[in-house]
Amino acid sequence: MNNTIISMKEKELRFLKFFHQQKYNVVDFNLIEELDWRRLTHEDLQQMDERSFWQQNKSIYALRNDFTDQLFRYYSNYPTHLKKVAYAGDIIRDNRVIKQVGIENYEPQFDNITQNFLDFQYFIQNVLHDDIQFVILGHYQLIDALLEKNHQTREVMEMIEERNLSGLIQKLTFNHPIIQILKENTLNQLKILSHYLPERHPAMVAIQSWAQWFTDHGITEIHLDVTAQAPRSYYKGIFIKCHLKNTTHSVLTGGYYHGSLEGFGLGLTL
């Protein structure tokens, strides 16, 4: 038990030290987030179903369940001059404490965020002694690009999320692009996608750019996910999920967001 605790703390510390050396600003935020009712958006209130929270006097408090969301709220209210930050700590999900390390980049141009990825990959290889086995790519504009608004009912969206092909065929017909893509192996879906989206569509450009970049850097097992639906309204672009070779519970996830704050985040569960 002692060795496990020490090993975990060492990983967090080495993460922060390494990213500090790479010119990231190390930040530390309280696990307990004090929320101001006057500043909570409708979306913030909807998230309360996912969080452990309580009210004391006239204040409401909640346990952190996502670093990106916490930093997004904070820096939206209190703008920062920081361009890229690194963090390590606990998040609470489904009543479980999970260790997470990650970064946020507030200048999310492609060259910047691919360098962020290379920094993370170096940490995975040289500190965790692991490597990326395969990548899942997606884009939060894909559903809107492939599915007509009148078909975006709760029932259909749930079927897409569940990959319920038989149900979708009844709702959309067999020849619908969503069904034609989903019936393919996820390794082949990127090729199929090009049949249904113009090559200059923003989602297509982003996915193709990342797929080519990964291939150029030796990561060739790339799956497409057309089913993902944005967990927050400000998630509007590419998202990435990287599974590691040696550990099934550690997943590197990231994505682009743009609301009151623009950025790109990458987080790894330890």
From Swiss-Prot:
Glycoprotein as UniProt keyword: no
SS bond list: none
GO BP terms, alphabetized: L-histidine biosynthetic process
Pathway: Amino-acid biosynthesis; L-histidine biosynthesis; L-histidine from 5-phospho-alpha-D-ribose 1-diphosphate: step 1/9
Family: Belongs to the class-II aminoacyl-tRNA synthetase family. HisZ subfamily.
Subunit structure: Heteromultimer composed of HisG and HisZ subunits.
NCBIfam families with a match to the protein in the record: PRK12294.1 (NF008947)
Name of the molecule in the record: ATP phosphoribosyltransferase regulatory subunit
Organism encoding this protein: Staphylococcus epidermidis (strain ATCC 12228 / FDA PCI 1200)
The encoding gene: hisZ
